[in-house]
């Protein structure tokens, strides 16, 4: 896969289509909404309205192959030293091609650019994050997350997601 992102480029075998990871724009709200809604129906992500996505569009990156939307992810600041990876999702065309790792690398580079030393996620895809340099940690070390999102989650008292953390410093 040939990968092109802002300031990040990786090449592989010829003949494969290019994966482009870029900052999202308001034109991406509908495909973002549809993807997140599908994951939310499966209980994997929290749902987000089109209005919320429009307000938060600058937090998202989009992955495309051949000009077609194949995945997304976002970065949300929880404090001066911590950001959260949110909403990493792929459609069938993006799965099994390393696109999730490309999205995660783009988000990690943005955290580094902002000089934020820690990046976390609550996830069911623990192996994916472990392969990308994260470690499993206790959720309780993230009170910022608990008070911003978990307080509104229906699984608040029976959360089955696993907390992962990567230190960037």
Regions found by a protein language model. Give the residues of each.
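A short helix-loop-beta-strand connector motif used in the catalytic cores of GNAT acetyltransferases and
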Residues: 51-66, 84, 157-160
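A short, internal acetyl-CoA/4′-phosphopantetheine-binding micro-motif in the GNAT/acyltransferase core
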Residues: 88-95, 124-125
